[in-house]
Each structure stands twice: as C-alpha cells, then as structure tokens.
C-alpha cells in the first residue's frame, strides 16, 4: 500500500475499441506469427511443387532459402521438360532465386505454347503462361487471352477465376484485359461475410488468400484500383490472418502471398496500430508509445501519427487535441507530461497519415489512467442519541489504527467520516468500491456496509444498534472495523484496520447461540428426498390373482383326466418336434421379456421364433391332413 506521499504514477492500459465507426484490423501477422509462417515454409524439398511453395513463399516474406545453389540444383535435377506443371514450378522458383538460370529446348517451348489453348484447363493455361513468362520466352498475349476467356466460360469455379487473374498478370499490358479485370467484382460478390468482421470464400482460407494476392498483382500490372471497398479489404485481412498454424505448404504459401500483396501494392495498405507493451510511466515521463506497422509487422517509419482528440469517457470532455506523435526508432511517442489527467478512462482518437494508400488508419484507443488514492480527514465519533452529551471525536491518520475502543449501544451511535483524494492532483475521488467491514473478534462473524458520499464528497458511515441489529443477529462483542477502498483505476487499493468497536445489543435481543457468519463457509449439504414406494397389496389379493391366472391350466388338466388325452396321433416327425419346441420357446420368451428384455428386443426374437414355429406347424398340419385322407 502506498502512502499519500508517494510519487505520482500513471498506469496506462490500452485497448483498441471495437465499436469504432471504421472497421479496424483484428487479425494480422505479429512478429512471432511471421516467424511461425517462415518456419512452416522453410522445409526440406520433397518434390518440385514443395520447392516452389517454399522458395516463392519465403521470397514473399523477403527471405531466401538458406542454400540457394542447392535449391537451384534440386530444381534442375527434378525438372520434367515434358510436363507443363513441372515447368511452371521450375520457372517460378528459379525466378525467386538469385543466379539460378534454367535453359529449355525448342521442344519444351513448343509444348508450353501448345498448352495455351481453350482445349486446356484454366490451370494448364495459367501454368503454361507463367512458365513462359518465368523463362523469359515470347508469348502472343492476345491469343492467350482469347484462349483463357473461352476456357473460363466453361469453368466458372472461384479457383479457376482466381487463376485467370494470376494468368492475366503475366500478359502484356497492351492486351485488352478488361474482361478479366471485371471478374474481380464478380468474385467480391461471391464472398461470404461472417459477423461483419470476416470476408471469405466458402472454398476456404487458401482460395481467399490467393484471390487477394492475384487481385493486387493484376491491378498493379494494369494500373487500375481494384473494385474492393476499404472495409472489405480489412474483412479479407481478418479472415486470412486469423489462422496462425498451417496444415499444408500450399496454405502457408497462399497466406505469405496475400501478406506480401497487402504490404506492397499501389492502392491499399492496411495500417496496424498497436500500443507498445504495457506502459507504466512516472508523472515526469507520461508517454504513450504506439507501433505503426503493415500486416507483416514491418514499421511504417515514414508515416505521420497525430492525436485528433482525447476525451474523458465519463464526462466526454476533450482534454487534449491536435497533437503530433514523435517518431523514436520504430515507434511513435506522445508525451503528455504537461497535461493534468485525472484518473479514469479516456478515448484517444489517433490518425495515421503520410501515404494515400493507408487504410484503417483512424483508430480509437481506450486509455486507462490510474492514480493513487489518499484518505484524509478521518474522524471517529460516538454520538449520544439524546444529544445531552457532546460528541466525542477522534481523528486518525492512515495507516495508523485508532487507540482505545469505541462503543455503540442503545444510548450512543458510532460514526465514521472520511474523504478520498487523488494524491497526485489533490482532486476528490469517488471510487466504485468503498466498504466498511466489521469483524467479530470472537465468533468470526462479518458484516459489510457500503459507505456513501454526500453532496460534498464526504463519506459517512453511522452505526445505530437499534436499526442494525438484524444484520448483526443482535450479537454483541468487540468488532474490528476495516475500511476497504477499491477501483479499476486505483494503483493502491486499500484495506485499513481503522479501530476496534464494542457493539452492545439489549440482552433480550441476544441470540441463544451465536453462530459464525463467515461468508466463505461451505453451504449446508442438500439432502435429496426420493419418492416413497407405493404400498404393495395384501398377500391374499396377490394369491387370489395368481390362482385366477393358473385356473385355465388346472381346468385343462382336469378335462384330460376326465375324457382322456389323445396322444395316439403324435408323431416324432421333425416338423412336429420343432413346432412344439418353438411354441415352448415363445412362452419362455414371454418370461424373459417380463424379467430382462424390452419390447423392441422381444419383437426381434419373437419374429425369428414365430417364423420357424409357423413353418413347422404348417408342415405338421399338412402331414396330418395327408394321413387322414389316406385312411
């Protein structure tokens, strides 16, 4: 706990407000994210395709593979001159490696030119055109464009359209690329919006990232601003960079390509504004530090950062406006040492300028300025209810404890008065949490009251035993009085043992047994009452019911004894034996159903037994009919 004499301290806790009018980036590649992405791309080559993803992906991040000569040798040794895909991977990979030249034959050139046909898929056309471009070979751009347009009309998938954009970026600027450029607007219309924050294709992250990379590469090539709104760019960015771990090389490659496109294009460069660390600055150096970067966390050191205004959240009063940040290394600093901020929350409106490509360059930062609370003018009084005796007042200085004890009974009340001030500015404070806690030294009983300020911000707590006996359960004794001060903007929350107070209640109100009122004791265990079973009927009723059930069987035996049982026609043919065994089994199944099975299980078994018994019984009766006819 700090004393009132402690030095002034501002604690700044910064968050970017989500409720601002302009959409701000919620996901981007932090420096650890960039390193993780780099590690995902920097893998041993297993094929020419994997080499392409690694080499070109790392190149998008501004990094070369560790061993360029070894990578170039791998490309040459794995190149298949008769395969368009292999030529594409080799051409694009060698372009990203310094000093890696690959020579190809005329037959290979003819193979690539032949692949630029409307009979080829869009993927094959893209790979052939990009390979020709990578090897520096001439190409009839208008013919390639015609083949691409014709084939695209047959393949209307999102990925095929994205590959058409990638293909067009390798064609001559003299070709009429408007039909391909118009596809961008159609693709934007096919994007799915999620919660107003994310924008992506249902095909997934990889396709979305490739679309962003292809769009800006083509627009830089033709010199036209893409038909994508700024908010849509931020939504695409949020969707692409929301994933930090990548399942495949191709996915990591697509994210790296999108990041490079959003960081280095001629039209839209999203700005990321991040408070640096968790600042804790003294009054002599009250500084707000901001990192201003692109999506790859690369500092925008040429930017200009300005504070439009700073407003108190509570009063909405403007306390600072039109102030520039100072660039210091890779960060921008705002020194508000000369501004007397009272504790609380402030909304800082910050704008980044210096390049007309910047988007999402206006952000709102919520700044919490903490201070230290001081307790002054603490008076403890005992006031006679009849006012026949002058109040006895004792002043206490924090953090000391008052000497002696104070008495509150049926004749006199106890009162506590105090004020709370900002030790840095001297201004009065009204924290959110101001409690008086009374702790019974003998039983551990605790009673907590809220201290409220009056119109002059003087806090008062008065204890009248006749009015408060319910809270105390009329339990007399010596109570320790604690003062609790807390608030989110306070650097030094206070728990102060102020004094001992003897509270006396009338003996007739005292409880027979004083129980602890500790708020943190376990609750009484809940005993669950189960429903009592219904009474069984008398034994006579049960026996009578059983006799009635068995009476048909007894009647059967009696009739057999009187008229005789005709067993002369019983045969030991298989059908006869199976029929009677099946009938007995069904009766046994009824018993098992009663004791163990449910209805559905019983029906399943009954269907099997019944079918066998039916067929056997039918056969048995047929044999009996034949026997009678013969006689």
Swiss-Prot record:
Pathway: Protein modification; protein glycosylation. It is a multi-pass membrane protein. The lineage of its organism: Eukaryota, Metazoa, Chordata, Craniata, Vertebrata. Glycans are attached at residue 106. Subunit of the oligosaccharyl transferase (OST) complex that catalyzes the initial transfer of a defined glycan (Glc(3)Man(9)GlcNAc(2) in eukaryotes) from the lipid carrier dolichol-pyrophosphate to an asparagine residue within an Asn-X-Ser/Thr consensus motif in nascent polypeptide chains, the first step in protein N-glycosylation. N-glycosylation occurs cotranslationally and the complex associates with the Sec61 complex at the channel-forming translocon complex that mediates protein translocation across the endoplasmic reticulum (ER). All subunits are required for a maximal enzyme activity. This is Dolichyl-diphosphooligosaccharide--protein glycosyltransferase subunit 2. It is found in: Endoplasmic reticulum; Endoplasmic reticulum membrane. InterPro entries: Ribophorin_II_2nd, Ribophorin_II_3rd, Ribophorin_II_C, Ribophorin_II_N, Swp1. Its main location: endoplasmic reticulum.
